Structure formats: C-alpha cells, structure tokens
C-alpha cells in the first residue's frame, strides 16, 4: 500500500498523463503481473498518435533501466509483445527501429544477493520477441487474427465511458451512488469479457499460433511467480538456519533449484540426466576429433612413404633412361608397389569404406601426377639429347669446313709459288715513252759515266756520282742496295778510273713516272737530235783505243748543247721530287725479287734512269 501511495505521489508531482500513469502501473517494480484489461487498454490507446508517443517514451525508459530494476525490464517486454500483437502498426515500426535495444536484452544478466540470476525470464522474452519481429509472415497472421477477435468483442458489448468524478466515499449524495453503480456495472462487464475470452480460448486448437502465444505468455507469468516464491522461501530458510541449533545445522540443507536452457524449473534428476547427456556428447565429439587426427596422421605417413617410394622409382628410371638414350628405345616404367587388399565390412556407408575410397582417389591422383612428371622428364631429356647431337653435328661440320679452307689456302699458296718459279719477272715500263725517246741520248750519256755535269765537273766530282754510286750509297727509293756484281765489265774506260756511275748490272726499279725506267736500247741517231752525226751510246768492246780522243773531243764540243737542253727541263726534276717513297716492306719485296733473279741467272738492263739523280 505504501508503494502505491509513493507511485501516486510521483505521478502527481511529475505531471504524468493518464496514459503514462497506466504504463507505469503496468510496469511497476512489484511481483504483480500486468492484467489483460490494462494491456488491452494500452493497445487501444496506441492508435492515438499522442498516446502512442507517450506509451513508447515510457517503455523506452523502462527497457533501459538498471539491473536492480529488472522487473521494469521484464514487464516492459511483456507490454511491448502485447502491443506488437494487438496494437497499432506504429508499434511494429517502432520495435524495428529500436531493434538493437531488444536484441541487447538477450544477454541481460543480474544476480541478486543470493547469487540467483534474475535475467533468465528477460532473456527468454527478448528472444521470443526478436524471432516474432524477424518472421514477417507469422506476425502478419497473428495481427490479422487478433484484429478480427477484437472487433467481435467490441460488437458484443458497448464500451464504458471513462468519466472520473472525485467524490467522498462517505458522502451519501446521489453522485456517489451513481459512481458506485457505474463501478459495479463495469466490474460485471469485465467479468463477462473475461468469461467470454476464456470460452474462446477453450475453443482454439492446440496448433493455433495465437493460442500458443497466449499460452506461452501465461506460462511465463506462472513461472515468474513460482521463481519469486522459491526465492522468498530460500531467503526465509537461510534466515532461520542461522538461529537453529547445531543439531539442526547438521541436517542436510535444501537442494538448490535447477533450470533448463529456457529458464523452466526442473528436478535434480532431470538436471543430472541433462548434464550426463552433455558430457557424453562432448566425450563423443572429442573421441571423433581424436579419430580424425589419427586418420589424418596415418594418411600423411602413407603419403610420405609413397613419395619416398616414388622418388626412388623415379631415380632408378632416370638412370635407365640415361643409359638407353643413345639406343633411342623406350624403357618400361617401374611397376608400382603392391598395395594390401582392404578387408572388413561390406557396408558402403561405413567410415572405413569412405576412408578407403578417399585413399584410393588420392593414390590414383598421385600416380597420375607421377606419370605426368615422368613424361615431362623424358621429353626434357630427349630434347637435351637432340640439342647435344645438333651442336656436335654443327661443330663437326664447322671443323670440316675450316680444314677444307685451310687445305684450299695451302693449295693456292703452293700454286702461286710454283707459278712464280715458272714465270720470270717481266720488265715493266714505268716511265713515259715519249719522254724517254726524246732524252734517250742524255740518259745514255749519264748512264755511261762520261762527260761533265751542268756545273762543269768531271770524273768523281760530278754531282750524279755522289748519289748514284752503287754499293756505297742507297737513296730513299732503295736504289744501290746489293747491285754491285762481280761480272766482268765491257767498258774499257772504267778499269783505271771512276768517273760517275760504275758499269754494273743494276736491277730496274719501278719508281714512278721518271724517264729512263724502261728497257734500254741503243739510241737511234737522227739529224735533229744529233746534228753532228756522232753516236753517244756506250762504247763497244770492238772499238779501237785510238778512237777515244776523237770521241771525247766531239763530246766536249757538244756538251754545252746537252747541258742547255738539260737545264730547260724543270718538269723532270719536279716529277722526281713528287715521286712517293717506298716503305720497308716494298724494299724487302724488291730484295727478294733481286735474289730470285740472281739465282735464275737473269741479267737486268744496265741503264740508269734520271730519277736516280
């Protein structure tokens, strides 16, 4: 009575409306359960927008209350479940918007001072409401059926008025009598509604979802009352046991209450049987796990042993293939090891047959992989052998070609040497024939060593003698190297004196465009070249000694004319200066040619060109 007074005072002080007061009374923190009339009244008021917001605001506060006010949470879930089933559609929408709040309550826990968990009933209600909200088809069917039932109830009775008048109960005025009659009439109508509802529920089949939901709610309320009664009795026994005698303390204490996973109280035997079943299932699961681990380990060992055998077989096959690669014959593959025949049950659904099938499949797969690996290795080896054979053939062919080239080169060199030995060196003309013919007399004069130079010198004082003395001087062109021979001279005038160039057999040199580098022939005297009719060729052996003074006299008379003609030819000096110099390889080649000519007995021309000047 005191709690109701305090609650009424709070309602007046905080200015709660009639709807909010009704929600607070339905979710009060006491052992009473909300009545069906109160829940139906809240469901009717949920169709009004103002009352709907007031109801949901108060329920939201109750659902988020502290753990010690667990009754607020449990009764709020009961009211909310009834509104979802019998209230307006806005109640369903609000629950879906605040779905996380209801889902969180599935883990609600609160233990009292004695260690008892008070959150069991809250968890059960929250799970039931969450499953109902998730199943839209079931929710739609329940709401449609409840709507038809509510309309039938409204047609059966008129709705009473909610006019409330404040009057003194001890007043004997007519208004008090009217209120009393109205209250009696309302109680009678409520009793009739309850009776009619019980009759309707009795007519429902046990499989009706609405009937099952209502029955579940009534069971939960009854269980909640029983739990509360048990807790009260436990507290009383604990308080009495503290003041009992030692003999009474030795008596066995009351056994604790046991509950199943749904929060329903069960006996100790049922609880022990449930625990035994759980332990047995856990032991069976653990045994199955151990069996699976052993099977996996055995399978791994078998696979490892098979891999070792396959590796050994592959090594032996590789050796055989290497030895038979040259013969190019296909070798037989090593036979597989004989597997033990399985024995046991013929049941196709037994675990042994399934494991055996798995092992056979794995073994067949491993054999296919090994066969593919062997084929790939054989192909690679054949390719390598083909490459080696091709490389060896290419090397052999290259060696044969090189040997043939060397043999051909040796034959060519031998033929060239034989050809050079068979054919003597031919005289080549390197000068200008017209110039040589024009100045043949001067060339002959200089070659014989008689006469004087342009400066009037005679004998060894002649300028050409300093540059054309063979055997003692070598010019830049190589003239004079090993040109002195021991053959007898035909000139009788060179036996006692040395006037210019000695009469030696000189090898003709190919020195460019200088005159005098052509085969020397006795000059033909013409009236134009020699008006005196005297020949200036080399004196022959048949000439008489008494003719020498006349020859010298005639030569001295004609000397100025020859010197003048020689001075008028600057072109020959330029040609001589422009001649390229031979390098050492050319000199060596010339020396070899001279030696070959001397061995063959070839006598070169004794003429000397003007370029030697």
Curated annotation (Swiss-Prot):
Signal peptide limits: none
The species this protein was found in: Saccharomyces cerevisiae (strain ATCC 204508 / S288c)
Domain of life of the source: Eukaryota
Family statement drawn from the similarity comment of this UniProt entry: Belongs to the epsin family.
Gene3D superfamilies: 1.25.40.90
Region of interest: Disordered: 140-208, 323-351, 356-375, 471-613
Extent of Basic and acidic residues compositional bias: 179-188
Domain ENTH: 11-143
GO CC, alphabetical: clathrin vesicle coat; endosome; mating projection tip; plasma membrane
Biased amino acid composition, Basic residues: 148-167
Protein name: Epsin-2
Membrane topology: Peripheral membrane protein
Modification after translation: Phosphorylated by PRK1.
UniProt-listed InterPro entries: ENTH (IPR013809), ENTH_VHS (IPR008942), UIM_dom (IPR003903)
């Amino acid at each position: 009575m005191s709690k109701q007074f305090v609650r009424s005072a709070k309602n007046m002080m905080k200015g709660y409306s009639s709807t909010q007061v009704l929600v607070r009374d339905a979710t009060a923190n006491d052992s009473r359960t909300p009545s069906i009339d109160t829940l139906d009244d809240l469901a009717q008021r949920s169709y009004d927008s103002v009352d709907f917001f007031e109801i949901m605001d108060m329920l939201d506060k109750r659902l988020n209350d502290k753990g010690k006010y667990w009754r607020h949470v449990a009764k709020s879930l009961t009211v909310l479940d009834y509104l979802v089933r019998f209230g307006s559609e806005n109640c369903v929408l609000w629950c879906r918007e605040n779905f996380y709040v209801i889902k969180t309550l599935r883990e609600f826990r609160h233990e009292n001072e004695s260690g008892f968990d008070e959150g069991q009933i809250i968890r059960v209600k929250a799970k039931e409401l969450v499953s109902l909200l998730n199943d839209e088809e079931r929710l739609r069917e329940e709401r449609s059926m409840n709507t038809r039932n509510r309309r039938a109830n409204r047609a059966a009775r008129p709705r009473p008025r909610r006019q409330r008048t404040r009057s003194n109960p001890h007043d004997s005025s007519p208004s008090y009598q009217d209120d009393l009659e109205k209250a009696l009439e309302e109680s009678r109508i409520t009793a009739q509604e309850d009776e009619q509802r019980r009759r309707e529920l009795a007519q429902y089949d046990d499989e009706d979802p609405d009937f099952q939901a209502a029955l579940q709610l009534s069971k939960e309320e009854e269980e909640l009352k029983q739990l509360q009664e048990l807790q009260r009795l436990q507290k009383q026994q604990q308080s009495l046991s503290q003041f009992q005698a030692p003999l009474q303390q030795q008596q066995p204490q009351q056994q604790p209450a046991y509950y199943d996973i749904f929060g329903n109280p069960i006996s100790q035997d049922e609880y022990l049987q449930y625990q035994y079943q759980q332990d047995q299932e856990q032991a069976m699961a653990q045994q199955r796990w151990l069996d699976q681990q052993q099977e996996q380990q055995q399978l791994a060992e078998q696979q490892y042993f098979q891999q070792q055998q396959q590796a050994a077989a592959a090594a032996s096959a590789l050796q055989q293939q290497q030895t038979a690669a040259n013969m190019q014959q296909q070798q037989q593959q090593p036979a597989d090891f004989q597997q033990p025949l399985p024995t046991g049950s013929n049941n196709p659904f037994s675990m042994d047959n399934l494991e055996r099938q798995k092992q056979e499949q794995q073994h067949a797969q491993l054999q296919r992989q090994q066969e593919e690996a062997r084929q790939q290795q054989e192909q690679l080896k054949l390719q390598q052998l083909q490459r080696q054979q091709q490389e060896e053939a290419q090397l052999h062919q290259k060696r044969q070609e090189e040997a043939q080239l060397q043999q051909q080169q040796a034959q060519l060199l031998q033929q060239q040497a034989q050809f050079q030995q068979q054919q003597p060196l031919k005289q080549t003309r390197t000068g200008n024939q017209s110039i040589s013919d024009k100045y043949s007399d001067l060339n002959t004069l200089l070659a014989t060593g008689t006469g004087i130079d342009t400066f009037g010198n005679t004998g060894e004082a002649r300028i050409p003698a300093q540059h054309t003395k063979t055997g003692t001087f070598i010019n830049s062109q190589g003239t004079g190297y090993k040109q002195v021979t021991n053959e007898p001279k035909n000139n009788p005038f060179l036996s006692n004196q040395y006037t210019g160039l000695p009469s030696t057999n000189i090898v003709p040199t190919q020195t460019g465009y200088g005159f005098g580098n052509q085969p020397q022939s006795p000059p033909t005297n013409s009236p134009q070249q020699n008006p005196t009719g005297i020949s200036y060729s080399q004196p022959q052996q048949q000439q008489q000694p008494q003719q020498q003074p006349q020859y010298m006299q005639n030569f001295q008379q004609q000397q100025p004319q020859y010197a003048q003609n020689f001075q008028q030819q600057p072109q020959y000096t330029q040609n001589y200066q422009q001649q390229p110099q031979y390098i050492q390889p050319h000199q060596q080649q010339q020396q070899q040619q001279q030696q070959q000519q001397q061995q063959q007995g070839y006598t070169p021309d004794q003429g000397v060109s003007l370029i030697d000047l």
